[in-house]
């Protein structure tokens, strides 16, 4: 008896998910495999996927357009939370996983499947993200994980697929594993597994090299409303168009490349190369506007909780209760994050050169100025310092008396 009758497989068109189709049928006795691929803005990469799955033995090959919810419901909350895992990675890949899992469960319900499956390996983050998200949304659904159990090496997996007429997508010339969506690209494997090897220019596609970036700088203005980016250089943009334009601007000037050693959920360190031009640009601008519009104690607390929010998303806990509670905090803080940030883009750098808010700024020039318009009561400082420093004076006196 097979492990399931009808399975919906999260499908990317890569080696592992393609091999999963015949493997589920031949080795695990699954009667029918339906694939689901999410359109997250990959572009031309999606074109051959539908037929590729059918050629591998899928009974149906479904592709769902998830670009708009991906940006509105996942990327924009990440911008409001200034989400940077370990202070650097803006979660471009991690943000996609809960959305794919959500739609995978919905498709399984629609077609009457008794299980879902994915092609994640046993040492990556995505297995955690998919399994935990599916368990959160549909604890009754069986999750099949052939790539975690089949025990084949990369070479053996490719050879298995070739038995069923699958061409190898990995060549000696291009040995990299690449994940792509509208927010960015993640590149790993091949020579990049040596952390001392510099990434060759050929692995980048969304950003220009510093040498190829324009010699002249470009100044832009990004406007935010309630923490969401809504316009660039005075032109209002819907969320998807906003990400595309931010990608174009930042990528042109070589902004958005990351090369980092990352701590995976499973406990190992991995070397990751990311291209996330637009997302990094928008987060930088958003952080700057918050410095102008949030009270000091709120800003400090939010910076601490941003790290926790980022960890939860990275660790696959998007649908968990703590993440939901933190969402409420983040949303409340954004009510007055309104204004404009001006940045200068040049040769890999985005430098903030101005920020302003007509209705939400907590910067009061008359209080900050040292000129004739200064309205700060300097005489009040003495009493404030006395009370502020009282615990220190009492502590110092106690030390002296104990000698």
Swiss-Prot record:
Name of the protein in question: Argininosuccinate synthase
Residues involved in ATP binding: 10-18, 38, 119
Reactions catalysed according to its record: L-citrulline + L-aspartate + ATP = 2-(N(omega)-L-arginino)succinate + AMP + diphosphate + H(+)
Pathway: Amino-acid biosynthesis; L-arginine biosynthesis; L-arginine from L-ornithine and carbamoyl phosphate: step 2/3
Keywords carried by this UniProt record: Amino-acid biosynthesis, Arginine biosynthesis, ATP-binding, Cytoplasm, Ligase, Nucleotide-binding
Originating organism: Synechococcus sp. (strain CC9902)
Gene Ontology molecular function: argininosuccinate synthase activity; ATP binding
Metal-binding as UniProt keyword: no
Binding positions (L-citrulline): 89, 125, 129, 177, 186, 262, 274
An annotated GO cellular component: cytoplasm
Quaternary structure annotation from Swiss-Prot or TrEMBL: Homotetramer.
Matching InterPro entries: Arginosuc_syn_C (IPR048268), Arginosuc_syn_N (IPR048267), Arginosuc_synth (IPR001518), Arginosuc_synth_CS (IPR018223), Arginosuc_synth_type_1_subfam (IPR023434), AS_cat/multimer_dom_body (IPR024074), Rossmann-like_a/b/a_fold (IPR014729)
Cellular localization per UniProt: Cytoplasm
Family: Belongs to the argininosuccinate synthase family. Type 1 subfamily.
The protein's Enzyme Commission number: 6.3.4.5
Positions of L-aspartate binding: 121, 125-126
Gene Ontology annotations of biological process type: argininosuccinate metabolic process; L-arginine biosynthetic process; urea cycle
Family matches, as Pfam families: Arginosuc_syn_C, Arginosuc_synth
């Amino acid at each position: 008896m097979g492990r399931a009758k009808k399975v919906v497989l999260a499908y990317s068109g890569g080696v592992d998910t393609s091999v999963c189709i015949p493997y589920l049928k031949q080795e695990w006795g699954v009667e029918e495999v339906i694939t689901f691929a999410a359109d997250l803005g990959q572009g031309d990469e999606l074109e051959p996927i539908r037929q590729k799955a059918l050629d591998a033995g899928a009974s149906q090959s479904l592709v769902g357009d998830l670009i708009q919810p991906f940006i509105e419901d996942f990327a924009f909350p990440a911008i409001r939370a200034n989400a940077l895992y370990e202070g650097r990675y803006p979660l471009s890949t991690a943000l996609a996983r809960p959305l794919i899992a959500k739609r995978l469960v919905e498709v399984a319900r629609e077609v009457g499947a008794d299980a879902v499956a994915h092609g994640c390996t046993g040492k990556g983050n995505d297995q955690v993200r998919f399994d935990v998200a599916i368990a959160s949304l549909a604890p009754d659904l069986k999750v099949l994980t052939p790539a975690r159990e089949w025990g084949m090496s990369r070479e053996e997996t490719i050879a298995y697929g070739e038995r069923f007429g699958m061409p190898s997508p990995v060549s000696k010339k291009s040995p990299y594993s690449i994940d792509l969506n509208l927010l960015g690209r993640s590149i790993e494997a091949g020579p990049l597994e040596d952390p001392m090897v510099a990434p060759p220019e050929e692995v980048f596609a969304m950003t220009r090299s510093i040498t190829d970036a324009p010699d002249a700088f470009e100044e832009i203005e990004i406007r935010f409303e309630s923490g969401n980016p809504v316009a660039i250089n005075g032109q209002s943009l819907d969320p998807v168009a906003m990400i595309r334009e931010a990608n174009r601007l930042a990528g042109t000037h070589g902004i958005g490349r990351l090369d980092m050693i990352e701590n995976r959920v499973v406990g190992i360190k991995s070397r990751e190369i990311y291209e996330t031009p637009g997302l990094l640009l928008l987060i930088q601008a958003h952080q700057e506007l918050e410095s102008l519009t949030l009270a000091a104690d709120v800003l400090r607390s939010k910076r601490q909780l941003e790290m926790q929010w980022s960890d939860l998303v990275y660790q696959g806990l998007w649908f968990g209760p703590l993440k939901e509670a933190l969402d409420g905090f983040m949303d409340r803080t954004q009510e007055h994050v309104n204004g404009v940030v001006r940045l200068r883009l040049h040769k890999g750098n985005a430098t903030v050169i101005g920020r302003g808010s007509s209705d939400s700024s907590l910067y009061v020039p008359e209080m900050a100025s040292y000129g004739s318009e200064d309205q700060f009561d300097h005489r009040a400082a003495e009493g404030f310092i006395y009370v502020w420093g009282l615990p220190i004076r009492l502590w110092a006196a106690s030390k002296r008396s104990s000698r």
